[in-house]
Amino acid sequence: MTNIRKTHPLIKIINHSFIDLPAPSNISAWWNFGSLLGICLIIQILTGLFLAMHYTSDTMTAFSSVTHICRDVNYGWLIRYMHANGASMFFICLFLHVGRGLYYGSYTYFETWNIGVILLFAVMATAFMGYVLPWGQMSFWGATVITNLLSAIPYIGTTLVEWIWGGFSVDKATLTRFFAFHFILPFIITALVMVHLLFLHETGSNNPSGLISDSDKIPFHPYYTIKDILGILLLIMVLMILVLFSPDLLGDPDNYTPANPLNTPPHIKPEWYFLFAYAILRSIPNKLGGVLALVLSILILMLFPILHTSKQRSMMFRPLSQCMFWILVADLFTLTWIGGQPVEYPFITIGQLASILYFMIILLILPTISLFENKLLKW
């Protein structure tokens, strides 16, 4: 008799995805981040669900309800800080996952890649709306600044912003709808993750060499299940060290002050994982130009399959491209640092140079270097 694992309509889907899945024999730890992102999503949905049981999305009580969660709810402080720092872990894994895709040419699976970029946008939107919910100073002013950017859209901008706000400023209506969207989006993300995996399993995984690995496949279970469990344990360990020893390390102290529309904080800045995009936004003196640069800084990822000029898929055997890749990483670190600095000399100039370099490396330098490396192959 055939194993139920292979015959049952539901179980066989799980079997083909996580058990009998043929996987390349040489994929490194950089391939762990997909499963880690899955774990992050599960942690965020579970902790978020328990937070939603005690949270109230009203301007009068939102801040107090978060305080109540931390003080009065059993292990409420743990749930709240796991959720807040879980978001940081989520973005660390996301950036590493995307970086892996860029380095090893995984973007040539363009359906998988494009859904991944849409997922990145969806997670960023969810994180932004989640940051507004505690209704502290940075929540309120962050929401005001970022939503206001839409007013840069010609003709419909102002109307659009007031429609999103549900009034003439960020207020009760805004908070309530942000909570509703923040609750629903993770489930939409989960559905998109399934589509992401569906397209990935049409082609199979890439591997560090970038070569076709059909001739050398191993079953996902037990080899990669045990490898994923190791990654998950490390992820949870780092998350719990962060939560239990320095839960406010990555947060902003301004968010412990209740939202006050009459008092603007000296430095309005988003959470650390948005700082690179915020720096690009601020580096252009024009409002519409800044908004376009902000959107393009992420949307540019969709151009990678078109901009790939090399005859090799992976950067494993392309030292010049490797060098530019790591300069791009250093540039993103620079942008992240600049995003958290005040708008004054020399930070303005550094930010503008780093922003120009970011787009230059992706649009011009990497494709040109790849063509040069193709020539080197003929020597």
Swiss-Prot record:
PROSITE patterns: CYTB_CTER (PS51003), CYTB_NTER (PS51002). SUPFAM superfamilies: a domain/subunit of cytochrome bc1 complex (Ubiquinol-cytochrome c reductase), Transmembrane di-heme cytochromes. The keyword Membrane applies. A ubiquinone binds at H201. CDD domains: cytochrome_b_C (cd00290), Cytochrome_b_N (cd00284). It is found in: Mitochondrion inner membrane. It comes from the Eukaryota. GO terms for biological process: mitochondrial electron transport, ubiquinol to cytochrome c. Disulfide bonds: none annotated. It is a multi-pass membrane protein. The keyword Cell inner membrane does not apply. GO terms for cellular component: mitochondrial inner membrane; respiratory chain complex III. The cytochrome bc1 complex contains 11 subunits: 3 respiratory subunits (MT-CYB, CYC1 and UQCRFS1), 2 core proteins (UQCRC1 and UQCRC2) and 6 low-molecular weight proteins (UQCRH/QCR6, UQCRB/QCR7, UQCRQ/QCR8, UQCR10/QCR9, UQCR11/QCR10 and a cleavage product of UQCRFS1). This cytochrome bc1 complex then forms a dimer. Component of the ubiquinol-cytochrome c reductase complex (complex III or cytochrome b-c1 complex) that is part of the mitochondrial respiratory chain. The b-c1 complex mediates electron transfer from ubiquinol to cytochrome c. Contributes to the generation of a proton gradient across the mitochondrial membrane that is then used for ATP synthesis. This is Cytochrome b.
